[in-house]
């Protein structure tokens, strides 16, 4: 395959990653609504450690465990941001 062929393949993979990240975020929205309803805290460090350990175990390379951890730390950070927005919006709606 040529460089352009590989780039097209990467482009398609990137599109799939975006789809999956948005699908994951939809789940996060639902979790945020449930946490708001039952009064659960936004930040749950034990759960985040569990997620990070799971993705590190699932990694078969060529990315290093450290690289996977950094990527998922960022994903989890964005997930908290989404949850925070959902929980805040739900609280705002309840106060109206």
Region spans (language model):
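Domain-level signature for soluble enzymes in the chorismate/prephenate branch of the shikimate pathway
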Residues: 1-96
